[in-house]
């Protein structure tokens, strides 16, 4: 089983301009994400897929492997599917470029179902939330996941799901962690499918898989590692890195 990590990276971002090149204690954000990915023990190769020469240049200067992709991709998974067509591998991880604190163990965790019996079409990660963590549950920028008893995804939503008509203290909500692993054929099938109705409604690419009958195995992680979507996120990550450098 040959696993490859693909990191989609576009320069423009609606909430944080040119965030992939934002400085994080002396290194661009995308470089820190790539360095963390290189520490995975299950993946044999790490490739950044981008449509930006600015991003490609800063990575290539540091020895990273980069593939240039079309600017027309509607989502990160379409971008990595384009790159994967010319890359040998059995399973591909879609690791977002804005995850500079991602743990190599977390990457290996999302890959783990593919190294076990009965691998899924796709795997992803979820993080448990308590019912009283209402701010996160109600935040539309935090995607919630519904799981069946076998750990497969039933649905993903920006809304609080399930709706709590009755008080159920033992109910666990799951926050989706946006990293995926795909079997090679499933990744290409995903890219060939049109944007689905629910995907467009929620602006969640993983719903394209569910609407078309593919399975998504959800692996529970206990590591809460912040990504970078806003200026506030960027400052949080900078403060974490400063603390780590002093320890």
Swiss-Prot record:
Domain of life of the source:
Bacteria
- Please give the pathway this protein is involved in: Nucleotide-sugar biosynthesis; CMP-3-deoxy-D-manno-octulosonate biosynthesis; CMP-3-deoxy-D-manno-octulosonate from 3-deoxy-D-manno-octulosonate and CTP: step 1/1; Bacterial outer membrane biogenesis; lipopolysaccharide biosynthesis
Q: What is the protein name stated in its UniProt record? A: 3-deoxy-manno-octulosonate cytidylyltransferase
Q: Sorted alphabetically, which InterPro entries does this protein's record hold?
A: Cytidylyl_trans, KdsB, Nucleotide-diphossugar_trans
Q: Which GO terms describe its biological process?
A: CMP-keto-3-deoxy-D-manno-octulosonic acid biosynthetic process; lipopolysaccharide biosynthetic process
EC numbers listed for it are 2.7.7.38
Which taxonomic lineage is given here?
Bacteria, Pseudomonadati, Chlorobiota, Chlorobiia, Chlorobiales
Protein location = Cytoplasm
């Amino acid at each position: 089983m040959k696993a490859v990590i693909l990191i989609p990276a576009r320069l423009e971002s609606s909430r944080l301009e040119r965030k992939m090149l934002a400085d994080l204690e002396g290194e661009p954000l995308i470089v820190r994400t790539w360095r963390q990915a290189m520490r995975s023990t299950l993946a044999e190769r790490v490739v950044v897929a981008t449509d930006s020469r600015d991003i490609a240049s800063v990575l290539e200067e540091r020895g990273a492997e980069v593939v240039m992709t079309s600017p027309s991709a509607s989502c990160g998974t379409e971008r990595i599917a384009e790159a994967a067509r010319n890359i040998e591998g059995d399973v591909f991880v879609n690791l977002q470029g804005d995850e500079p604190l991602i743990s190599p163990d977390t990457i290996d965790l999302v890959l783990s179902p593919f190294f076990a019996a009965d691998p899924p079409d796709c795997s992803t990660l979820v993080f448990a939330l308590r019912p009283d963590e209402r701010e996160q549950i109600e935040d539309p920028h935090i995607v919630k996941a519904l799981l069946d008893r076998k750990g497969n995804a039933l649905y993903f939503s920006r809304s609080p799901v399930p709706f709590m008509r009755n008080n159920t203290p033992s109910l666990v909500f799951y926050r989706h962690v946006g990293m995926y692993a795909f079997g090679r054929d499933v990744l290409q099938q995903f890219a060939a499918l049109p944007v689905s109705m629910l995907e467009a409604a929620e602006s969640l690419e993983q719903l394209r898989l569910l609407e078309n009958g593919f399975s998504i195995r959800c692996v529970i992680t206990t590591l809460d590692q912040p990504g970078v979507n806003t200026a506030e996120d960027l400052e949080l990550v900078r403060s974490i890195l400063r603390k780590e450098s002093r320890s």
